[in-house]
Each structure stands twice: as C-alpha cells, then as structure tokens.
Regions:
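Glycine-rich, histidine-containing beta strand-loop boundary motifs that form or position
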Residues: 1, 97-99, 119-123
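General structural feature for long, well-ordered alpha-helical segments within catalytic domains
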Residues: 3, 42, 46, 78-82, ...
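Active-site beta->alpha loop and helix N-cap motifs at the rims of alpha/beta catalytic domains
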Residues: 3-5, 10-107, 112
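A solvent-exposed, charged loop/short amphipathic helix patch at secondary-structure junctions
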Residues: 16-25, 169-182, 273
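Hydrophobic alpha-helical scaffolding
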Residues: 36, 40, 121, 180, ...
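Structural signal for hydrophobic packing residues in well-ordered secondary-structure cores
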Residues: 47-54, 58, 87-90, 135, ...
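Catalytic alpha/beta core domains of metabolic enzymes, predominantly
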Residues: 116-248
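C-terminal extensions of enzymes
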Residues: 247-318
Length: 318
C-alpha cells in the first residue's frame, strides 16, 4: 500500500483514467474493491517489464512482489485466498505475506499451491526461521505430490532498517544509554545470524534485506547468497561512493556492539536469538506492530484517494 500510494503521488496522470474506468465499470463496488483492482492493475503492468528476465532465468529472477492486505495479518485463510488470487494475475508474481502467526500458516499453504512467496513484516531471527520452515513444508508437500518446484524462488525479507528504527525508538522511550551508532548494527546483526542458520540448514528459501538506512545495509552483505532490494536513490549513492566492493557477508558484527545491544536492549535479545520469540509472539513484537500499523495507515490513505474519485468533496470546488 505504501508503494502504491507513492506511485500514485508521482504518476497520477498515468492512472487517473484507469481509476475512473474501474469505478464506472463496477457501479456496486466499494472503495476497497476499487482500490484492490487498481493495485492489481499496477502490479500486472509492472510485472510485464520483468517478464523477459523471468523467462530467461527460468522463474528464478524477474518477479514482481505484490502485498496481501495488511488488515488480514491475523487471518491465514484470507491471506492464502488473496495470495493465490495474486499468483494467477501474471506468471511472475511474488506474493508478499507478513511473518505473523497467521502469515506463517499462509506461507506454507501458498507455497504448497505452487506460488513463490516473499515474507514481509519480518525483523527477527525467529521469524525468519519460521518462514523458512513453512516454505520447506510447502515445498515438501509439492514434491510428495509430484509437482514441480524448479521455477519457484521463495524469499524471506528481514527489514533491517526498520529493526534499527525500532531499536532507536526503544532506546529513546526507555532512556537506555548505549554508544552512539550501536543501534545501526541491530538489523545487520539479526540478518547475519539468520543467514548463518540458513546456510547451515540448507534452506531453499533465501534471505532478502530491505528498508535501507545507510551503506552498511548493502556493504556488509556483499558476497552473500541473498537478495538486496536497494531503492534507486540508494543505488545512486552507493555507485558514486568510495566504499570498497568486497565480500563482507561472513564478517561478524563487532562483538562489542552485539554485546552492548544484547545486554542493554531486551527487544534486541529476542530479535537476535533463534528462539527469542514463539510464533504466538510474532504479532506483538514492537517492530511488527509498528510496521503493520504503518502499512494499514498507508492502505487507508490509498482508499481515501479512491474515495475522492467516487465521492468528491462537495465542500470544495473541483
């Protein structure tokens, strides 16, 4: 929803007529139904740009991620139903499902049905391992049924920058005194620990780093069997920088920093330890709740844009 809202803000001239046409063609639809029709149309349009890569790479690259309704974060059945609908929109769709307790269930079901997932709203090692295990169960079910999995490319996003953000909020809220800059390593520490476990266990699911805040979120992950979704402005900065491009994925986060985060911030401890959270605790983790609230708010802003098309404000001249 956030990305769709950003696209509309920049390219409304490209979508205004399409929105009006959707509304006119479906006179009984609610603003939510119109909003999702628009989201799907945007996703299909964007996916076409990647089809050549998708075909060349036999489905392992060239996918377009489309996010399930953030309001469904507690409902595995609705996440699964919507995810499978999205998978049918184009051959190269990647289905974004939150790493909530219900989302973990949906990830297994969507994977078992043959769709590639992108787990989102994920910040902790425990969440990332639950995602990888769910994907493994789904793939095993397909294998047992004799169904092909060779073109599937599931990923689990750890939102490294948003975990850093949450550490900053906790430090300020709880008046925790630590060295300046330590919180900027929190996401990397969790990511690198999860990566080590992924490599050890040989998971088919791959880790993806998202939510960039500084160059370490790129430079410290160079050389890994990972996916980096680097926004264009950050790409330009990194390309023009003098940061040496060398393999660092196996370089541990400085021990003194990890020790400080671990000893001072309880929310870091549960994010860093593989058994730090149970699945039942995923939804209540601070970064999870904070991000879900933001995604839902962005969705409501998108719906408000659609509302202005359907019910223009009579208090102002158009």
């Amino acid at each position: 929803p956030t990305i769709v809202g950003d696209v509309l803000a920049k390219e409304m001239h490209l979508w205004r007529d399409r929105i009006s046409a959707i509304i006119a063609s479906h006179p009984t639809w609610t603003e939510d139904e119109v909003a999702w029709a628009l989201i799907e149309a945007m996703a299909v349009t964007a996916s076409q740009l990647l089809l050549e890569v998708f075909d060349r790479e036999h489905g392992l690259k060239g996918r377009l991620s489309i996010q399930t309704n953030p309001k469904f974060y507690r409902d595995a059945a609705r996440l699964t139903e919507q995810g499978l609908r999205f998978a049918g929109l184009a051959p190269n769709m990647q289905i974004k499902i939150p790493a909530t307790a219900a989302g973990i269930q949906a990830i297994e079901e969507v994977t078992a049905a043959g769709a590639s997932i992108n787990a989102t709203v994920c910040f902790t090692v425990a969440q990332s391992l639950a995602v990888a295990d769910a994907v493994a169960r789904g793939l095993a079910r397909r294998d047992a049924a004799g169904q092909d999995t060779s073109r599937m490319s599931p990923v689990c996003t750890i939102m490294v920058g948003r975990l850093d953000d949450w550490m900053g909020v906790v430090v300020k809220r709880d008046q925790i005194v630590i060295d300046p800059g330590a919180v900027h390593w929190a996401g990397l520490a969790a990511f690198k620990r999860a990566y080590g476990v992924y490599q050890q266990r040989g998971y088919r699911c791959r880790l993806l780093a998202a939510a960039y805040r500084h160059h370490l979120h790129w430079s410290e992950l160079i050389g890994g069997d990972v996916v980096l979704t680097i926004p264009w402005p950050w790409q330009k900065q990194f390309n023009s920088s003098d940061i040496e491009v060398s393999e660092r994925i196996d370089h541990p986060v400085p021990g003194a920093i990890v020790d400080q985060l671990h000893s001072h911030i309880p929310d870091f401890r549960v994010a860093y330890e593989p058994d730090g959270l149970t699945e039942a605790q995923f939804d209540g983790y601070g970064a999870t709740a904070r991000t879900l609230r933001g995604f839902i708010a962005s969705y409501q802003e998108l719906v408000a844009v659609i509302r202005d098309f359907m019910l223009p404000n009579p208090d102002s001249r158009q």
